[in-house]
């Protein structure tokens, strides 16, 4: 078994094994098996870093075996600098989420942790797939465990939220399936994504392909105006579900733009870049303003995610090295920061059972250790230098200035909104006098919560202070992508 197969199937097999346990039996054993499975999945990604060769844009760790031979469908995996970091990020967040749900989940424990481990493997599969059908299978299969996580362990309106999540993302993907089949026919019967990158395609077909992929990926990111499912889903999802959704699942859509939309339809991508930039700026500015008026902490952070992902798509479609690399760095940083923000909300919700900002105030007086972590993650969400939230956004702004000064100015101005809604929430929840009896009786974080938040704090600070390892791996692949996109496919 190759290294990528090991990274994909280790958590999936542990997840399937967990499903064999009884509904609420052996909960203690289940938790330990889940943690061992998550750690094994993370350890399986370590050799990838050691063996990754810098300076080459070629796919590495390639595995290829026949799957459905009649239609030339292959189990074809590979990693390059663009996709590399999302594999260990997914495995890392899975470990954190297992720790987060350790004491909180008391019903259907084996199914809960099993669903998360299976979801982890499927998401890694999306980032590794080099066959169109294999990508589609992994991409769509991620909906099933997340649908169950929201629908079973979510809030009072969980069924509505689960259906909305499932239908929005599934309907968007149907057009992508049509595009994949068209490319299969056009290429003479191949689902090889890398072969599709070299396929000559006329202008009209490129435009249709671009918008077919846009339908699938824009909903997943989500971009404005197809973002409306995200706040509803975050509000109802359990804490672990929100953390994984924000930290990893939103990245599947953004990754799709780099693997499909831009290299397969480069002329259409350049032609419609202005539209993508406008939609991205609307997400950053307008959705940032919407976040400022939210009274529900989860909704505020959900809208914050839409705004931060707007920086990602903005970076991609300004078509320069700083923009694309900055977008990728922002994706990784957002994985750490947004996951941490949702887990902090979960810590409070487990104690007070309210997500309303008005229910809190003065939390720093009763939970000083927790408030210190919350302050760090809030500063990272604002884009404070020396935190992970700063690096990607700064690179995107520099890339935007390089492309057009006024575009860069608009992007930089939008950072003000991020600071405004984050600091407004922090002030009302953590500072000031103790608001009510619920807050007055709060206990500070326990050892499990301290470990969970410490892991994320280390990641946020390390990436903010020393981002070079992250950018070093992606630079060559980003340069190759931009070189490819700059060449017209029109005859």
Feature annotation, model-predicted:
Residues 1-10, 79-90, 132-145, 204-219, ...:
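Structural signature of hydrophobic alpha-helical transmembrane segments
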Residues 2-3, 17-114, 190, 194-198, ...:
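Transmembrane helix-loop-helix hairpins at membrane boundaries of multipass inner-membrane proteins
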Residues 5-21, 35-48, 89-101, 119-121, ...:
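Central hydrophobic cores of alpha-helical transmembrane segments in multi-pass inner-membrane proteins
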Residues 15-20, 46, 95-99, 121-125, ...:
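Alpha-helical transmembrane segments of multipass membrane proteins
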Residues 16-27, 94-106, 148-158, 220-235, ...:
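C-terminal ends of transmembrane helices
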Residues 24-29, 114-118, 122-205, 290-303, ...:
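Alpha-helical multi-pass transmembrane bundles of energy-transducing inner-membrane proteins
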Residues 52-74, 173-232, 257-275, 323, ...:
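Juxtamembrane/interfacial segments at transmembrane-helix boundaries in multi-pass membrane proteins
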Residues 224, 338-342, 408-441:
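Predominantly late transmembrane helices and immediately cytosolic-facing juxtamembrane segments
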């Amino acid at each position: 078994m190759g290294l990528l197969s090991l990274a994909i199937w280790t958590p999936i097999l542990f997840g399937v094994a967990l499903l064999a346990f009884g509904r609420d039996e052996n909960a203690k054993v289940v938790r330990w098996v889940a943690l061992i499975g998550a750690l094994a999945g993370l350890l399986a990604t370590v050799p990838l870093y050691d063996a990754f060769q810098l300076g080459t844009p070629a796919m590495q760790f390639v595995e290829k075996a026949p799957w459905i031979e009649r239609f030339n469908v292959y189990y074809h995996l590979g990693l390059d600098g663009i996709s590399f970091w999302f594999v260990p990020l997914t495995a890392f967040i899975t470990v954190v989420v297992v720790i987060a749900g350790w004491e909180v989940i008391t019903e259907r424990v084996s199914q809960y942790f099993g669903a998360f481990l299976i979801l982890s493997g499927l998401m890694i599969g999306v980032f590794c797939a080099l066959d169109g059908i294999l990508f589609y299978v992994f991409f769509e299969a991620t909906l099933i465990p997340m649908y169950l996580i929201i629908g079973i362990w979510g809030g009072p309106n969980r069924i509505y939220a689960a259906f909305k999540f499932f239908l929005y993302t599934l309907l968007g993907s149907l057009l992508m399936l049509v595009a994949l089949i068209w490319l299969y026919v056009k290429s003479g019967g191949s689902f090889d994504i890398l072969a599709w990158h070299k396929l000559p395609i006329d202008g009209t077909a490129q435009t249709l392909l671009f918008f077919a992929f846009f339908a699938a990926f824009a909903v997943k990111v989500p971009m404005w105006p197809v973002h409306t499912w995200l706040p509803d889903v975050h509000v109802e999802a359990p804490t672990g579900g929100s953390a994984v959704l924000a930290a990893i699942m939103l990245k599947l859509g953004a990754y799709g733009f780099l693997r499909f939309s831009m290299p397969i339809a480069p002329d259409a991508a350049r032609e419609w870049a202005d539209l993508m930039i406008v939609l991205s700026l609307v997400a950053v500015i307008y959705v940032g303003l919407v976040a400022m008026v939210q009274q529900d902490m989860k909704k505020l952070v959900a809208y914050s995610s839409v705004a931060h992902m707007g920086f990602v798509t903005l970076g991609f479609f300004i078509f320069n090295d700083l923009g694309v690399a900055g977008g990728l760095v922002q994706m990784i940083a957002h994985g750490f920061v947004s996951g941490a923000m949702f887990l902090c909300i979960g810590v409070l919700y487990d104690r007070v059972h309210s997500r309303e900002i008005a229910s809190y105030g003065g939390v720093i007086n009763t939970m000083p250790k927790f408030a210190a972590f919350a302050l760090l993650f809030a500063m990272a969400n604002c884009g404070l230098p020396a935190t992970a939230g700063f690096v990607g956004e700064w690179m995107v702004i520099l890339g935007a200035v390089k492309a057009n000064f006024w575009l860069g100015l608009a992007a930089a101005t939008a950072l003000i909104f991020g600071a405004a809604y984050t600091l407004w929430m922090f002030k009302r929840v953590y500072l000031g006098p103790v608001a009510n009896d619920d807050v007055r009786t709060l206990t500070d974080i326990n050892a499990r919560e301290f470990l969970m938040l410490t892991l994320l704090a280390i990641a946020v600070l390390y990436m903010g202070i020393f981002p070079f390892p992250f950018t070093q791996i992606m630079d060559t692949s980003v340069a190759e992508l931009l070189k490819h996109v700059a060449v017209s496919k029109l005859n």
